[in-house]
C-alpha cells in the first residue's frame, strides 16, 4: 500500500492562523456590540439630565423675549455652551466609534478575502491533483487491459499490484473529494458569515448616521440660539456705543475732507506742471522755426551771390569772345581780363569751400550739363564744364590768350558747380 498523500500547507496562511484571526475578529465585534448595542446613545442621557436639570433654560424655542434682563441672557448662553460641549463630546465619541468600526470592517474584509484566496488556491491545487490522479488511473487501466506474458510467480503478481494501486488511487480520489466538499462548505459558511457581518455593519452605520443627523440638527438649533443671543448682545452694545460712534464718524468725515483737499491741490500742481511743459515745448518749436527761417534766408543770400558771380562771369566771357574775334588786339587788355577772371575764380573757390557738403550733388549736375560727344557746338558759345577754346577753332590767338581762356573756363566751370550745388540746396530746403 502507498502512503496517504497530504496536501502542502498554504504559504500565506494556515488553517489555525485563519481560525485564530477569525476568532479574534469575532471577539472584537462582540465587545464592540456590547459597548454600543443600546439604542439610546451615551450622550442622550446627558442631554436629558441637562434638559431636566434646567427646564426653564430654553423657553419659547430656546430664546428669551427682547425684554428679558441681561442676567437671563448670559445664563442661557452658559447653558447653551455646556450643551454644546456635551454634543461635541458625543460627536467625538461617535467619530472614534465610527473609525474603530471602519477599521474592524477593513480587517474583516481583508481576512475574508485572504480566506477566499486561500480556499480558491487550495481548490485549484486539489483539482489539479484530482486530474493528475485521474490521468494516472487511466494509464493504469490501460496497462491492466493489455495482455501480459505469463511469468513465474515470484511473490505477488503484477496484476495484484496494479489492483492495489487502483484501489489506493480510488481512496485518494474519495478523500480529495471529501476535502473539496468540506472546503466548499467552509467557504459557504464564511461567505454567509461575511454577509451577516456586512449587514450588521451596515445597520450600525445607519444608526451612526441617524445619530449624526440628530446631532447636526441639535447643533443647528444651538447655532440659531447663539445667533439670536449674539444679535441681542450687538443691539445692546450698539445702544451703549452710539455717542462714541458719532464722534468717530465726525473724525472720519474730517479726515476725508482733508484727503479731498490734498488731492485737489495735487491735481492743480499737476496741471501747472503740464502747462509749463507745454509752454516749454512751444518755445522750443518757435526757436527751431526761427533758426530754420534764418538758415533759409542765408541760403537765399548765398544763391543771390552765386547768381551775381555767374552774371559777372558771363560778362567776362563775352568780353573774351570779343577779344578772340579780334586776335590782333593788345595783350594788356587780355592781362586785365585774366586778372579779373582769376579773382572771380578765387571767389568761387571760397564759396565752394563754404558749401563743400553740397559739392557732390553739384558735380553730378555739372556732369549732366556737359555737352554730349559728337554734338555740334556753335563757335563763340560757352558751356559749363568746357575747359576753353582749342587753337584749331581760333588760329589767330596766341598761346597766352589760349591759356588765359582755359583758366577762365576753369573758373566758369567751378562757378557753375557752386551754382548748381546752391540750387540743389535750395531745392532740398523747399522740399523740407
UniProtKB/Swiss-Prot annotation:
Region span, Disordered: 1-77, 349-411
Sequence ranges of Basic and acidic residues compositional bias: 349-362
Alphabetized InterPro entries for the sequence: GOLGA6L, GOLGA_cons_dom
Pfam families reported for this sequence: GOLGA2L5
Highest taxon above the source species: Eukaryota
Biased amino acid composition, Pro residues: 1-11
Keyword set, alphabetical order: Coiled coil
Compositionally biased region (Low complexity): 366-381
Start-end of Polar residues biased regions: 51-62
Coiled coil spans: 157-354
Entry similarity comment: Belongs to the GOLGA6 family.
Name of protein: Golgin subfamily A member 6-like protein 9
Amino acid at each position: 500500500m502507498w502512503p496517504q498523500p497530504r496536501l502542502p500547507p498554504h504559504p500565506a496562511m494556515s488553517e489555525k492562523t485563519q481560525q485564530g484571526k477569525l476568532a479574534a475578529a469575532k471577539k472584537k465585534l462582540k465587545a464592540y456590540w456590547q459597548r454600543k448595542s443600546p439604542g439610546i446613545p451615551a450622550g442622550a442621557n446627558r442631554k436629558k439630565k441637562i434638559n431636566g436639570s434646567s427646564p426653564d433654560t430654553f423657553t419659547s424655542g430656546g430664546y428669551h423675549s427682547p425684554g428679558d434682563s441681561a442676567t437671563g441672557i448670559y445664563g442661557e448662553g452658559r447653558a447653551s455652551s455646556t450643551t454644546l460641549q456635551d454634543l461635541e463630546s458625543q460627536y467625538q465619541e461617535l467619530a472614534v466609534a465610527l473609525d474603530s468600526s471602519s477599521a474592524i470592517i477593513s480587517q474583516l474584509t481583508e481576512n475574508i478575502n485572504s480566506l477566499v484566496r486561500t480556499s480558491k488556491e487550495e481548490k485549484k491545487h486539489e483539482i489539479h491533483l484530482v486530474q493528475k490522479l485521474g490521468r494516472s488511473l487511466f494509464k493504469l487501466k490501460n496497462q491492466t487491459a493489455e495482455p501480459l506474458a505469463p511469468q513465474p510467480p515470484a511473490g505477488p503478481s503484477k496484476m495484484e499490484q496494479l489492483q492495489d494501486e487502483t484501489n489506493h488511487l480510488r481512496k485518494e480520489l474519495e478523500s480529495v473529494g471529501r476535502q473539496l466538499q468540506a472546503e466548499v462548505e467552509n467557504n459557504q459558511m464564511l461567505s454567509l458569515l461575511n454577509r451577516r457581518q456586512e449587514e450588521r455593519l451596515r445597520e450600525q452605520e445607519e444608526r451612526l448616521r441617524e445619530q449624526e443627523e440628530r446631532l447636526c440638527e441639535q447643533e443647528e438649533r444651538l447655532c440659531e440660539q447663539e445667533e439670536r443671543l449674539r444679535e441681542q448682545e450687538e443691539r445692546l452694545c450698539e445702544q451703549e456705543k452710539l455717542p462714541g460712534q458719532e464722534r468717530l464718524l465726525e473724525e472720519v468725515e474730517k479726515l476725508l475732507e482733508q484727503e479731498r483737499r490734498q488731492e485737489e491741490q495735487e491735481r492743480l500742481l499737476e496741471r501747472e506742471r503740464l502747462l509749463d511743459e507745454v509752454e516749454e515745448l512751444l518755445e522750443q518749436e518757435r526757436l527751431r522755426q526761427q533758426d530754420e527761417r534764418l538758415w533759409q534766408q542765408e541760403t537765399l543770400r548765398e544763391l543771390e551771390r552765386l547768381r551775381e558771380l555767374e552774371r559777372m562771369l558771363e560778362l567776362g566771357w563775352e568780353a573774351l569772345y570779343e577779344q578772340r574775334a579780334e586776335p590782333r588786339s593788345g595783350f594788356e587788355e587780355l592781362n586785365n581780363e585774366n586778372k579779373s577772371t582769376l579773382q572771380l575764380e578765387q571767389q568761387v573757390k571760397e564759396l565752394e569751400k563754404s558749401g563743400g557738403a553740397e559739392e557732390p550733388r553739384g558735380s553730378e549736375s555739372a556732369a549732366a550739363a556737359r555737352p554730349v560727344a559728337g554734338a555740334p557746338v556753335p563757335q563763340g558759345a560757352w558751356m559749363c564744364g568746357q575747359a576753353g577754346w582749342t587753337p584749331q577753332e581760333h588760329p589767330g590767338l596766341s598761346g597766352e590768350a589760349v591759356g588765359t581762356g582755359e583758366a577762365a573756363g576753369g573758373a566758369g566751370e567751378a562757378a557753375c558747380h557752386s551754382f548748381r550745388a546752391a540750387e540743389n540746396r535750395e531745392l532740398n530746403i523747399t522740399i523740407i
